Amino acid sequence: ADIILNAELVPGIGGGICQVSTTLYNAALLSDLEIVSRVNHSLPISYVPLGRDATVSYGAIDLKIRNNTDRHVLLKARVDKDTVTFKVFGDLPRDMAIGIETQVLETIEPGVIEQVDAKSPPGSRTTVQTGASGYLVAVWRVVKSGGVEIRRELISRDRYKPQPSIVKAGPSPQAVVIP
């Protein structure tokens, strides 16, 4: 699977492991566990909403969760072909509901990188890579009891870098002087 390296998706060892950390992160959020350490990806990913991802990188970036409750908690993981599932067992009050809300605070437009290619026809322009917007996102955990909101906790403010468009351009056409 692909990994993000220098703001680009490239094949690499460990690609896909972030789907496991992301699934665990969401299970922990929805179980009202404390997120001690978590880093979002540098680019938006497609398999969860913005702000709901958790990247890991061996020896550098880790997801750390703490049971900050006075209850026992059991985490159970299951992998079945291409599906990973985490179940969290514990004692939440019956009428308690936990939800996650995300809000895009800012959309960051991508720039354009123009690469002059002497082998291309003069004046030509070819898009090599289509750009993608970046985002600033806020994530809240919302806890309700009996349908009434009792706590709203800002979990994170995440920034996702925009990816610029890359355009290959031929040299400027020569000016023609008419006498």
Regions inferred by a protein language model and the residue ranges of each:
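Well-ordered beta-sheet/strand-loop patches within structured domains
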Residues: 1-179
